[in-house]
Amino acid sequence: MTSVVSSARRTIRIGSRKSQLALVQTYWVREQLQNSFPDINFEVHTMSTQGDKILDVALAKIGDKGLFTKELEVGMINEEIDFAVHSLKDLPTNLPEGLALAAITERENPADALVVHENFKDKQIDTLPAGAVIGTSSLRRLAQLRNQFPHLTFKDVRGNLNTRLAKLDAGEYDGLILAAAGLQRLGMGDRVHQILPKEISLHAVGQGALGIECRADDAELITVLKAIEHPETRDRCLAERSFLRSLEGGCQVPIGVNTEINGNELILTGVVASVDGQNLVKDTVSGNASDAEAIGIRLAELLREQGAQEILNTIFAEIQRGS
C-alpha cells in the first residue's frame, strides 16, 4: 500500500497493556499494519493500568470508568504513544476529549464460553449439578446465569487467563465463564467446553473486537489505522456501544447484547438484568445498518419503558455502597 505518512514520520508508537492477551492482540495489530505499511516502524510500548494492578477486589466494586484504558489514554494525550490497542469491551463508550475510536478490527467469536474442571467433562451448563461452583468476574454473566441456573453457586475470579485456569484445574472452581475470543487468541481454544448460546448469555458490548484509539486530530494516523478496519464489525459495535451509552451503563454492569447483520439490516438484541437474576428485561430492535447508533438508542428507550432504568439504579446504588 502506498504510504500516507509524511517522510518525517517513520516511527509510530503503539500503546498496550502488559498482559499476555493484550500483547498478543497488540502484536497482531502491529503485524497487520506492518504488512500494509512496510516503510513505517511500529514500536510497541507497554503500560500497566489500574485494572492490572488491583487483583483482589471484584471489578464492579472498583468502578469501571477506564479501568483498563486510562493510563494508555493519558499516554496518548501526553504524546508518549500515538495509538492504543484495546479489547473493545473494556473501552468506555464516552472517550476523553481529544481522543477518537479510529478503527475496529474484524470480530472474533463474541460469545461467552464454559470451561470445566476435568470432573465435569460430561456436563453442559444446564446439566451441572446443584451447588457446582462457577467462576466469573462479570456481573453481566452472573446476572444472566443466576436467572436461568439458580441452583449453581457463583464465585468471583480475578487474574489473567492462565491464573484463572490454574485455579480451575486446582479444584477451586468446577467451571469458569470466559470470553471465547480471549481463549482463541491465546491458543487455548481447546479449553472451550461449551460455547454459550445467546439464549443463555448475551455477550458484552464490543466483545471479541479490538478497538484502536488515537488522538482525534491526527488525521494522518487515522488514515493508516483505517486500513485494518472491518466495516461490518464497526456497524455492529457502534450499535452496541450506542445502546450502552444511552443506558449510561459501564463495562461492568449487567448489560448484554447480540447483533446480527442480514444484508443491510442490523438486528440488535439487548438485556438488562439485576445482579441476583430475579429481574430481567430483554428485547430486539432492527433497522438499516447505516443507522447503527440510532438502533442502539431505540433499543435503550424500549428497555427503559420495560423497567431497565429501575434495575440499573438499584445496581449503581449497591455498587456505591460496596455491597
Swiss-Prot record:
Keywords: Chlorophyll biosynthesis, Porphyrin biosynthesis, Transferase
Gene Ontology biological process terms, A to Z: chlorophyll biosynthetic process; protoporphyrinogen IX biosynthetic process
Cofactor(s) the protein requires to work: dipyrromethane
The protein's enzyme class: transferase
Record InterPro entries: HemC, Porphobilin_deaminase_cofac_BS, Porphobilin_deaminase_N, Porphobilinogen_deaminase_C, Porphobilinogen_deaminase_C_sf
GO MF assignments: hydroxymethylbilane synthase activity
One Gene Ontology CC term in the entry: cytoplasm
Catalysed reaction equations from the record: 4 porphobilinogen + H2O = hydroxymethylbilane + 4 NH4(+)
Cofactor annotation comment: Binds 1 dipyrromethane group covalently.
Subunit (UniProt): Monomer.
Protein role: Tetrapolymerization of the monopyrrole PBG into the hydroxymethylbilane pre-uroporphyrinogen in several discrete steps.
Note: The porphobilinogen subunits are added to the dipyrromethane group.
Protein family per UniProt: Belongs to the HMBS family.
Name of the protein this chain belongs to: Porphobilinogen deaminase
Species assigned in the record: Nostoc sp. (strain PCC 7120 / SAG 25.82 / UTEX 2576)
UniProt lineage: Bacteria, Bacillati, Cyanobacteriota, Cyanophyceae, Nostocales
